[in-house]
Amino acid sequence: MVSDMLGGNKRWILFGLLSFLLNCVLVSCSVEDIEKAANDSFLWGPYRPNLYVGIRPKIPDSLMTGLMWSNVDDYARFSKMRHSAEHGDDIGAFGWKHYDVRRGGQQVIDDFLMGIKLETDFVKLPEGNWALRVHGIPLPGAPTDLTTSLFFYAYVEGEGKVGTKVNHANHVYMEGKTPDLGKFRIQTFNRLGEHPVSPASVDLESMVMDKDFFAGFNVKKEGAWRTSELILYLLDTKMKVISDKEGYESLKDLPPAYSTLTLPNLPSEEGLQFIQKVFKGEFMFDIVFNYASSKKISEEMISQAIDKNLQEFEEKFQATFPLKAPYDTEKAHQIFAHTAFSNLFGNVGFFTGDSIVSKNPIELDDEDYEFMQGFESAAGKLAEGTAFHDIERSLFTIVPSRPHFPRGFYWDEGFHLLPVGLWDNDFSLEILKSWFSLVNEDGWVGREQILGEEARSKVPDEFQTQYPDIANPPTLILALKGYIERLQEQQGKLNNRFSGEGEDYSLDDLEYLRSVSISNPEKSVQFLRDLFPLLLRHYEWFRETQKGDFETWERECFSQVEGYRWRGRTYQHCLASGLDDYPRAQPPSTAELHVDLLSWMTSFTRSLHFVAEFLGETEEAEKLAGYENAMLRNLEDNHWDEEVQAYCDSSVDEYDDPINVCHKGYVTLLPMMLGLLPADSGRLTSLLKLIRDENELWSPYGIRSLSMNDVYFGTGENYWRGPIWINMNYLILSSLYQNYINTPGPNQNLARSIYEELRTNVVNNVFENWRQTGIFWEQYDPTTGKGQRTKDFTGWTSLVVNIMSENY
């Protein structure tokens, strides 16, 4: 026996080993329980951010719900029914006042055209249930007795069904079942509000419209997302039938819109289901989702959850983002910060579908390759067989703008996860895992995730195709770096709660569930170990597909390998860089080396090196350290221009001799933004002076994307040719704060003065624009500071919260 071979004194070793193994089994069970509790806490959410109100689970092909509404005092406005968030809607500021993905929150929509202010409170309740409270208040200036029609709908995308039923009290509700959710019921409860009176007709007496209207329709599941189009078609058809029957010649002859534009009360066992409510003046009702096996939800429970959500949010915000002077005294600054962060967190979406992928790289490996003037039609490429519909995939992500960009963007996401990771570490890791699950066998991830027909409906045809050699700045590494920094900060501070000797924990404690991957060393190591192969594959894809050409054009530099070029340039754009129309070499050339891409690759390498060391991957760590050193050397050899005193792109002239292509701006500053320069560097001194020069990049509102002295400043599309972007200003401030203002040396004082003044300029400008308009903008004018382009852009513009709290 093994025990005999060990000897008497060593039997205790065997006993200890068995005890350890038993403990591991118990720990494993605990980890599974914790992961289930964590996943359950963010299973449901407003994960259809392209809609004003859309609740679904984080499950592919499952239950989809949404809310639509319109004023029905007349027929004209009904055609502009609210459903999907549209850039051109006559809606003022809309979005979340407070929101937490594990609890819920409150959204406010000022609908000027419909004359109504909608407050929607989404709350998560015990046993996985949820409720949506809808409160409508006539806006100032609108009739206090205006009539509003609202449609709540539900359908199942995959296996399962949902139907409408009527109980003995003549109350309509929905009931359904799916493999993932089991049996469930959705009910609505009117809490406040009067109802219009339908006019008398030949057949019916006038009556108060206090009952819900309802109907179910069998539609193809792949087209069920066109919900508002279906309702508009059906009720428009009903209106025409009535007109023909009664001989009405104009809309003026018709009965009031609120009495005509109603559903026919047809129950259905499956398909797309609607419950319609019609109110006069102010109203409130609850929509309640209940699992069949759980207790019923009361009005009081919903009200208490709403109040608790607000209280918990305010306390959590103060603990995570305590605002620093001069933003720590005024209530307005606090509301502003709450709104900015909530609308980032409320932009989370879960998407499933296929994408259109080109069969060939955009740049063929061909000596006769010519750079394109623009991009090709997706429909055309599909028709000619040069593109295909890739397999269906799912993505959990944060979208930059609900009305304009309701889909996943690779380079935006790294910025999105910086504040989210501070609030809820483990939730940010869920999104990281979701993105890296998209890494294909070659290591590629599409820069835009346009998954399915609903997502494609928001994207121009020429931008729908994804090319397997087009990259994007690898900003997800910023989020991973943030996680690593939190790990370092917590090492040695927290006991391992799984050892049986640590603190007690409860699976109902959301604060605990937010940070399991920090407090539990086993889980943190496992997360990084699972991610590391995907990171490496993705990294090697960058190295291979974006490598510069050192064979055709030799350079005098440390390494004949470490130089990179964004693929997919056109004459006017370099979409892969994320900086679209930022000036590059003209004409485009395969000889180019892009300084911003080398900077991103150096940062990518540095973070991967840390992960390799953390995991004990010594050989990989040594290789990465060698890459990083070569990259830093080549950054100086190939990209520093002594005359211009800036980092520049590199290309060749008509004689094939190397030249620098210098356009001072964000590209120039990126080595400093990513903390690649030593604190005592003379190069840093030059960049700091460039930043502070009012004739170049400095403005009272933030750092401009391109120098005012550049020939391309403010020209053409003028997207990245001067306008101020908050994500890039964040990188400047973050790097100054973390790397330079507290390090003694020749640059410390200048770095500190720039940091203090720039922080105030950026925050004050974003705040002032929000105070005047209630809107967070995509970018800000470089000469006036006025917000412009996409409104309701609460993606990386929300980094203003990190800046206010100096939480980098």
UniProtKB/Swiss-Prot annotation:
Lumenal-facing ranges: 32-808
EC number, as in UniProt: 3.2.1.106
Residue positions with a glycan: 39
Topology of this chain in the membrane: Single-pass type II membrane protein
UniProt keyword annotations, A-Z: Endoplasmic reticulum, Glycoprotein, Glycosidase, Hydrolase, Membrane, Signal-anchor, Transmembrane, Transmembrane helix
Molecular-function GO term, any one: Glc3Man9GlcNAc2 oligosaccharide glucosidase activity
Transmembrane segments: 12-31
GO process terms (BP): dolichol-linked oligosaccharide biosynthetic process; oligosaccharide metabolic process; protein N-linked glycosylation
Active site: 580 (proton donor), 778 (proton acceptor)
Catalytic activity entry: N(4)-(alpha-D-Glc-(1->2)-alpha-D-Glc-(1->3)-alpha-D-Glc-(1->3)-alpha-D-Man-(1->2)-alpha-D-Man-(1->2)-alpha-D-Man-(1->3)-[alpha-D-Man-(1->2)-alpha-D-Man-(1->3)-[alpha-D-Man-(1->2)-alpha-D-Man-(1->6)]-alpha-D-Man-(1->6)]-beta-D-Man-(1->4)-beta-D-GlcNAc-(1->4)-beta-D-GlcNAc)-L-asparaginyl-[protein] + H2O = N(4)-(alpha-D-Glc-(1->3)-alpha-D-Glc-(1->3)-alpha-D-Man-(1->2)-alpha-D-Man-(1->2)-alpha-D-Man-(1->3)-[alpha-D-Man-(1->2)-alpha-D-Man-(1->3)-[alpha-D-Man-(1->2)-alpha-D-Man-(1->6)]-alpha-D-Man-(1->6)]-beta-D-Man-(1->4)-beta-D-GlcNAc-(1->4)-beta-D-GlcNAc)-L-asparaginyl-[protein] + beta-D-glucose
Cytoplasmic side: 1-11
Similarity comment: Belongs to the glycosyl hydrolase 63 family.
Listed name of the protein: Probable mannosyl-oligosaccharide glucosidase
Species name: Schizosaccharomyces pombe (strain 972 / ATCC 24843)
